[in-house]
């Protein structure tokens, strides 16, 4: 099964404290639709990020370049037989996310550096990723994991997420390990607001009502040890 998806939207990030997060959850669960993945306390998101030999994607983000990208494998269950292979590109205020659903066997080959497996998928996006990853010497760099609560509004493809318990590992990149040892990254909670074109007024009012500070912080960059050097 190879499913492809493309999403283009505005993404804004904020840092909030645990008390604000609790208050916001109470409001959102009454006014918006909960994501189908949500459990009582949200769901796990685990990603394996790839970067170039010299960490160009990391430094492009840190330097605030207008055009930058991230490549990752993503799963919501380490035991899952399918994963998302994603390319996120930032162009001004817009984020473009291209994704493929791929079998675990192909994901494992990518982790091992066998990017030629992408050529076997007969998919334009996979061919594009092959060229990027092979030409720029991409390597798996870092596992990033956190807990997510997500709420949606169908109009304008609006999605609000509350991410907490951010953890990472650069020494062990076994994305399939259910008992993976991870290091805490931050105690902060990240609020993300994603939408097409404009934010509906009642959703904007909810976001405006909470204490927050806008940030451009990337979970990937926060999770890399080189960010502390």
Model-identified regions with their sequence ranges:
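Phosphate-end processing signature that detects enzymes handling 5′-triphosphorylated RNA
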Residues: 1-229
